[in-house]
Structure formats: C-alpha cells, structure tokens
Curated annotation (Swiss-Prot), chain A:
It catalyses: RNA(n) + a ribonucleoside 5'-triphosphate = RNA(n+1) + diphosphate. The gene is rpo1C. Its main location: cytoplasm. GO terms for biological process: DNA-templated transcription. This is DNA-directed RNA polymerase subunit Rpo1C. NCBIfam families: RNA_pol_rpoA2. Keywords: Cytoplasm, DNA-binding, DNA-directed RNA polymerase, Nucleotidyltransferase, Transcription, Transferase. One of its GO terms (molecular function) is DNA-directed RNA polymerase activity. It is found in: Cytoplasm. Its EC number is 2.7.7.6. Pfam families: RNA_pol_Rpb1_5. InterPro entries: DNA-dir_RpoC_beta_prime (IPR045867), RNA_pol_Rpb1_5 (IPR007081), RPO1C (IPR012757). Belongs to the RNA polymerase beta' chain family.
Length: 395, 75
C-alpha cells in the first residue's frame, strides 16, 4: 500500500524489513527514481536495514551524557549576546546562548516574549480584516489616540482625540463621537472621575483643585489600556507564502497566549508563543514539550548549528516535562532533585548539600555515574554494567 | 472556550483501559508509577481521565511516523 510506483515484489521485499515508515518511503523513492530490479531492491533494502539496526542506540549507552556533549559543544560556538532581528521583521528576539539558557532554565517569562498569530481564512487573506484583529491585540493607550494637555488655570486634563486614528483603530465603528464616548467611559471607570465630552474633546479634573492630583491623573491616564491586550506593545503584520497562496501572519511583541486564542479571527490551531509556561498553561505538557523542542532547535538553527540531532533536544524536553510540569535543568530543577547526595554535591553548592545530607542522615546508594566516579568504582554503563563469572563445571 | 485538542501542538490523548495497560507494563517490565506523569489539571487531558488513570499519547514523531507514549495522571 505505498504511494510509490513500484512492483508488488519490490514492495513485499521492502515491507519485510524492520525499517520505520519514513525510511521505507525513502527507500521506495530511491528505487523508483533509479528503476532497479527486484534483486537489487532486495539488496538495497537489506543494506539499509543493516545500517539502520547498527545505528540504533545500544543497551547501556549513556544517552544523556552524549546529549549533553552534543548540545554543549555547539553551544560554545554560539554568540554570547545577540539582540535585534530574528528572521521576523522588526521584532527584537533574544537569540543564541542567552535564549538557550533561558529555555533550559525554564524561566517564567522570556526576555523578549513574542507570539506568532495565525488568522482564520477570511481574515488571513484580507488586509483590512487582518488589521481588525491587530487592533484587538495591540494595546492602545491614550498617547496613541490624541494629545493630552493640562490646563492648570482650570485644573483640567484635556484630551484632543485624533479622528483618523480613532477610525483606524475602531474599524467596526463609523462614528467618532461614539468612540470618544466609549473612551470617556473607560476613563471614568478607571480613574473614578467624571468627564465632559464634546465631539472628540474630553476633559476632566481632580475633585479638589490640587496640582499634585492633576499630575497624578495624567500619569494614571497614560497607563489605561483602551483596546487590545495589556501585555502586547506592538504587532507586526506580514504577508507570508503558504502551500496554497498567501496569508497574513501577525507577530507580536509581548505575549498573552490565553487571551489571544479567544479573539475572533485568530486561528487557535496554529497560533504559537515563545513562552513555554504560557503554552503549558493553555495547552498542557505535551504541547509544552513540542514547543521546547521547536524553540531549542530554532535557536540552534538560527546560529547555523542545525547539525545537532533533534533526538538530543527531544531527550532534554522529555526530562524537563517528565513530572507533568516544566522543570528546569540545574540546581533548582532536575539536577537538584537527584536521589544521590554526591551527585548533587558534585553539581553546585557542594558544601550545602553535604551539610544538609549529614544533618538528615542521608544514604547514598552509589547507583549513578557521578557517585561512582567520586568513589573510584566502575560506572554502571556500557561494559561497566556487565559482570563476567567463571563457570564452576568443566567440559 | 478554545478547543485545546484542535491545536497543532497537542497530540491525541486517550485513556488506556486496564487490559491494555497491563500489556504495556509487562512489555516494558515497569510499574505504573515509573511512567512519566501528567497533571490532572492538564488542559489536554480527556474529560473522563481521573487520577491513577494512564493516558496514551500518540505524537506525530520527528524521527518516525508516530510515537506512542504513556503518562500517568497525578494530582
């Protein structure tokens, strides 16, 4: 049952091997391309199978150590500090080593949170409609809407709203007065003052004439979010090629994954975020694991280190999500929760671990690698875990 | 409310029944508690999953077609 144009005999030969689906497909396409006969096909399939079985990890192979080395070595070639630009237009994204450290440390919030927001079909193809979503996401504060001036003589804050901006940011409302009214209401409920609104002019002042209160009001006014999501400071809209045509994709500076998924027009099946904790909260551990792998792989690729095998990154992500939550590698996470005192002491803050272990009377079973290296015994990996015994009978 | 299971990043989760679970545990010679865990509050869990259940997760694997893993539901 293959999509490739090969004879039934060849198919039987290839299907007979222990290869995984993906490799079988590759074998098929090579056979099809070269037009080889059944005998040759059999030999090819057997050779590929032998090679595949050879490259599988042996029992007792120290996969963790190999992963650590395989990520660590390319890590030394990474840039210590890169800001600016990450393939995505005009958006600052932390990259290189700082980003990698951030990921394995499982920081609560990344240095530069961002989201990639995909849109539902009707929004994704129409620039106007895509902009509707942009204004639902990007936080709109008063400075973007008009000019604020303080009238000290009458103790008033005066806002002169810009009509064009209003119409642009509220694309579904056509009446600037109605929008200004909405803004005035938001101000009233947030600052607890009464406002006077006429056309696009809004003015209000403190209850008692006080210069300090007046300035305080202006400060607070600047913080109010009139539209959009508070955390998101900027949205960039980009046209991207897809398999079937073009679509608009939004990139955001700042992230609030949960809020964005609920917005109308947002495709909740493809939208992603670079904060693994937000993904975990909204989509669960498995999605967080996927994101961890994607993000670490992208970080390495961005630095031209794409020859690191994904399997290493998958192992790291597996360990980090093993307990059903996201744990960091390191003293406060995986390495700090090891059973062995000696292994923990060998990692960081040696004295504290030894002291605590002594106080609590901990016992070290000497099961792991580090402990055995410390006490000078063979480690239980590879040939170290195999015991040979001489037979008692002679024959 | 957004349907979490529709997201590309979320693989298929399903509760494993007793017999299947027994087969899996004997195959790998492990106890149920040796499995990786998943929190009861996890968004991707099926509604009928309870603490102590094991869920089967069928991932779209990067290295083969699909990878089947199991997680034990914990508090």
């Amino acid at each position: 049952m293959t999509a490739h144009d090969v004879s039934a005999d060849i198919e039987a030969v290839v299907e007979d091997t222990e290869l995984p689906r993906r490799l079988k497909d590759e074998v098929y396409s090579t056979i099809e391309e070269r037009g080889v006969g059944v005998d040759d096909a059999d030999r090819i399939a057997k050779a590929v199978e032998t090679r595949y079985l050879d490259t599988r990890v042996d029992p007792l192979d120290p996969v963790g150590t190999v992963s650590a080395q395989s990520i660590g070595e390319p890590g030394t070639q990474m840039t210590m500090n890169t800001f600016h630009y990450a393939g995505v237009a005009e958006i600052d994204v932390t990259q290189g080593l700082p980003r990698l450290i951030e990921l394995v440390d499982a920081r609560k919030t990344p240095d530069t949170p961002m989201m990639t927001v995909h849109l539902d079909e009707e929004y994704a193809t129409d620039r106007e409609r895509a902009h509707e979503v942009v204004w639902k996401i990007e936080a709109t504060r008063i400075l973007a809407l008009g000019d604020i001036s303080t009238n000290v003589a009458d103790m008033l804050v005066e806002i002169d709203l810009n009509e064009d901006t209003l119409l642009e940011r509220w694309p579904t409302v056509n009446d600037t007065d109605a929008i200004a009214e909405e803004i005035a209401e938001t101000i009233e409920s947030n600052l607890g003052v009464s406002t006077r609104q006429a056309g696009t002019l809004i003015e209000f002042g403190p209850e008692e004439p006080s210069y300090r209160d007046l300035l305080q009001l202006v400060e607070e006014l600047r913080e109010i979010v009139f539209k959009g999501i508070e955390e998101i400071t900027r949205v960039v809209i980009r046209k991207e090629e897809t398999d079937n045509g073009e679509e608009f994709v939004l990139y955001t500076e700042g992230s609030d994954f949960g809020e964005v998924l609920d917005i109308e027009g947002v495709d909740a099946s493809r939208t992603t975020c670079n904060n693994i904790h937000e993904i975990y909260r909204e989509l669960g551990v498995e999605a967080a694991r996927e994101t961890l792998i994607n993000e670490t792989m992208n970080t390495l690729e961005e630095q031209g280190l794409d020859d690191v095998n994904v399997r290493h990154l998958m192992l790291v992500a597996d360990i980090m999500t093993n307990e059903g939550t996201i744990e960091s590698i390191g003293r406060h996470g995986i390495s700090g929760s090891k059973d062995s005192v000696l292994a923990r002491a060998a990692f960081e803050v040696t004295v504290n671990h030894l002291l605590d272990a002594a106080i609590h009377g901990e016992v070290d079973e000497l099961d792991g690698v580090t402990e055995n290296v410390i006490v000078g015994k063979p480690i239980k990996l590879g040939t170290g875990d195999v015991n040979l015994r001489m037979g008692t009978t002679q024959d | 409310m957004v349907d979490v299971s529709q997201h590309d990043l979320v693989p298929d989760h399903s509760v494993v029944d007793e017999d299947d679970l027994e087969a899996v545990l004997t195959e790998y010679e492990i106890k149920k508690t040796d499995l990786p865990k998943i929190k009861r509050t996890d968004k991707a869990l099926p509604d009928d999953a309870e603490v102590g259940d094991v869920v089967r997760i069928v991932r779209d694997s990067r290295t083969t077609d699909e990878a089947v893993v199991y997680r034990l539901v914990v508090e």
